[in-house]
Amino acid sequence: MSDYKTTLNLPETGFPMRGDLAKREPDMLKRWYEQDLYGIIRNAKKGKKTFILHDGPPYANGSIHIGHSVNKILKDIIVKSKGLSGYDSPYVPGWDCHGLPIELKVEQLIGKPGEKVSAAEFRAECRKYAAEQVAGQKADFIRLGVLGDWDRPYLTMDFKTEANIIRALGRIIENGHLHKGAKPVHWCADCGSALAEAEVEYYDKTSPSIDVTFNASDVAAVLAKFGVSRVDGPISLVIWTTTPWTLPANRAISLNAEFDYQLVQIDGQALILAADLVESVMKRVGVTQWIVLGDCKGADLELLRFKHPFLGFDVPAILGDHVTLDAGTGAVHTAGGHGPDDYVISQKYNLEIANPVGPNGCYLSGTYPELDGKFVFKANDLIVEILREKSMLLHVEKLQHSYPCCWRHKSPIIFRATPQWFVSMDQKGLRKQSLSEIKDVQWIPDWGQARIEAMVANRPDWCISRQRTWGVPMSLFVHKETEELHPRTAELIEAVAKRVEADGIQAWWDLDPADVLGADADNYVKVPDTLDVWFDSGSTHASVVDVRPEFGGHEADMYLEGSDQHRGWFMSSLMISTAIKGKAPYRQVLTHGFTVDGQGRKMSKSIGNTVSPQDVMNKLGADILRLWIGSTDYSGEIAVSDEILKRSADAYRRIRNTARFLLANLNGFDPQKDSVKPEDMVVLDRWAVGCAKAAQDEILEAYESYDFHRVVQRLMQFCSIEMGSFYLDIIKDRQYTAKGDSVARRSCQTALYHISEALVRWMAPIMSFTADELWNYLPGERAQYVFTEEWYDGLFALDASETMNDAFWADVLKVRSEVNKVIEQARNDKRIGGSLEASVTLYADANLADKLNQLRQELHFALLTSKARVERYENAPDSAQATELTGLKIALSEAEGHKCPRCWHYETDIGSNADHPEVCGRCATNVGGNGEERKFV
């Protein structure tokens, strides 16, 4: 026989070497959706314990960006891993569909409501636009390989959801958390509306920084407090502000009761300043000489009166803890209509909450002659001039500082007292209850707890009303004169909700009050306000989770969003759920960081460093994107660049190559007929299955703790090191040259089969497309999809009490590593070509020699040499090479004999078998005899 190649068990598989993901994935998706994969999973998991990850709705505007991909893929990894862990984990994607960004887009298309189109036409166009945006984003999310109920997502503009949002407001009112008041709220003049905290961003702004004097009305009273008999010139309390435009609303000056204040004489006037700030104030205003006339506590000055610098009335000195020594003068100009701290302290002292600014950001008529009708930020310089003319300006300079701006317009915003509806944090104990609930939630990373606790502890009442067209109406009736809510509000809200459930929010705007109020209609008016969109999304635990049948009435186990949502969706959901149900809407909250480029810079179109998920999928495939996300520690910033994605593609190839090797060597293996019992397997094969079990234990623990980068690290270690660098290399000889149906070969295939069954499941949550592809090439009967399965339970490990236990094989690996170094040196010296041309002698101490001798004649297979023998360490010649292992030296020589054309080992018995004279004795046995026996390697 001359062609012995036909006697080899060469690897063979239809599983392609190249993933070609960009081309293959769309075909897989087509099959998934034609066969209703999501429905198949739901049926397979029916009756299992549930795990509900509630989708925080992205805003229905624009194409998805790389941050969307991170968010959706992380959710998908969790949902799929929970399914493999034995849970029924339905995933219902959602979209946030109301609000200002959509209004602005539609305004560009058809004009403002009430001008070119009616409000009803405008809302209809907004609904249509949002639906188009949802369709576009949905297609991209599906392309990512994210499985969910895409045919029945939840939209906050669904009629039923809109109705349930209104019902959620009704329950908040029933529980006593709603109140109306003229409170200062973040106000955008460009929007003409109040903004939620989450709609506020901070940018640098240059403002006038001014020190202003308020002259004492009763000089004698002030002198008495400081124990001073006379001063030169007027006595003034000095305030420092960077918002001169708020001075028309000033109604007090706040001091800190505990601070020491000094009366300081400068040229021609005496100033009252916090003692600790005198030096810094003098330096700022350019005064080099001053005299301290007297001291007193802030508490001593309470209710003394001072003259407003230009409005001609007196204002009191009041006391507040919000006054600090961080900057300024120790005296804070207080305008209750323009700041939350000012509002609180003004309420305490029963001061007027003045609001001289209109919704367009301009002063109302009657504010001050030079200011009436002026835009507030343009009035800053006017006010500085007025103060200068009145000799009330001590100092002015420009200051660059961080200033709140509208997230949409990027323009500076103001605090402005307006009639609004609020969810009260304290009137029914909502703040206290929310803080208590936070402690029962698992926050991942754990610093999230302290972050949201601080936000809840310090946040003002939540302004939930907006003056917008495209939003869920508040659906309230108030008395024309008293402005009190109708006594039958709960009943009326349900009546409106039923109409909205049938016809959408337009039903409210079309509603004639007489239809629900009867004769009472003449006494009541409809509230024109809409709800903050954060109320829409924040109530989805009630409007969606509580009512979707697949959730079975269970609350959400997890919310997962970017770390900005502590003050956004996590906060609004907590507020509403606690106000309605008295408990948090989630058990776990997981946050991820934001994407940055390879240099750590924020993604920006202007810089040109954005990465489009669509481009990545079209070029590399979604599985590369998924592997990048899975391999990243998402708790901090998430770096992405072409180079980083290339590394992910390289890692993908290593994993795919391992999977392909496994499949190729399972050719012809039927697990039902050909599997070898563990006790009959070659020891090395049992060790390999044990390696898989150890890897699986770590991988499952990492999935359970949402440490997906640890999953990928362990997967890579298993594929590259334990399998690629050792086991898969060693078994090639036995796999290819042993008799096809021998125990030696079937033992190896049994190990490869068990490893493949585990590997495909480890991959499935992260590399979903490739896992599905691999699943369809695995031998044996199996379910249609890996996604309906659970973690593989067929793995087993070596017993620690066995002689050839894991520790034994760890020592063999170390010896092999040292042998490889010697072989590599010999190859570099041109003494040998490949490792099979080598014969090695291992000079080992007694302990190591005993271990190596247990492998008997199979030792050389573990070392990938043609021959290997063990000698006593003390007999090592000088030519033997020392190693990094204590008690081991190695001598290498050329292997004797000739190269067998079948197994490529160098043997001296080639030609000894008359039937097969061209091959070695071992190959002759494998070709024409009963086949060789392997026990260890």
Curated annotation (Swiss-Prot):
GO biological process terms, semicolon-separated: isoleucyl-tRNA aminoacylation
Subcellular location: Cytoplasm
Cofactor: Zn(2+)
Cofactor note: Binds 1 zinc ion per subunit.
SUPFAM superfamilies: Anticodon-binding domain of a subclass of class I aminoacyl-tRNA synthetases, Nucleotidylyl transferase, ValRS/IleRS/LeuRS editing domain
GO CC entries: cytosol
Gene Ontology molecular function: aminoacyl-tRNA deacylase activity; ATP binding; isoleucine-tRNA ligase activity; tRNA binding; zinc ion binding
Residues that coordinate or bind Zn(2+): 900, 903, 920, 923
Chain location of the short sequence motif 'KMSKS' region per the record: 602-606
Protein family membership: Belongs to the class-I aminoacyl-tRNA synthetase family. IleS type 1 subfamily.
The protein, known as: Isoleucine--tRNA ligase
